[in-house]
């Protein structure tokens, strides 16, 4: 009997089975930026501003770095449970985060676009903190270290968040 989290058992839930019959498949992404097939064209800055994102045990996290000015996603990152991913070359500007937590990531390819989502224990949040990576033409390098842990089904982070739904997470 395995634990109810990604990689610890081979039990397919009825929801996952229904999704598989509609073209979805289980996937174990590596940590880092998703490729452009996920619908986000990554935007890079000239300086090495970065986020270090550390995830505790029990859940993986998909993170969207959102421009405060345009409310548009500039980077879409996957961080597997128990790992740290460094997101380099964040452009100057102000950002907030959208976070999807969960287990059992599944993907479905439709044409040249790939959809992805957690299919067990999924929940979604948005940061209320604004991460300021400096003014345009500044030479100062800015870095943030984010620590994300899920304890008893809720996130315990070193930044503030509010709950959002899956649709709000998906909207760029």
Task: List PLM regions with ranges.
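Short, acidic Ser/Thr/Gly-rich low-complexity loop/linker segments typical of extracellular
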Residues: 76-80
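Short, surface-exposed beta-strand/beta-hairpin micro-motifs centered on an aromatic residue
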Residues: 82-87
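A short tyrosine-centered beta-strand micro-motif
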Residues: 95-97
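Primarily secretory-pathway and cell-envelope proteins
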Residues: 2-69, 73-75, 102-172
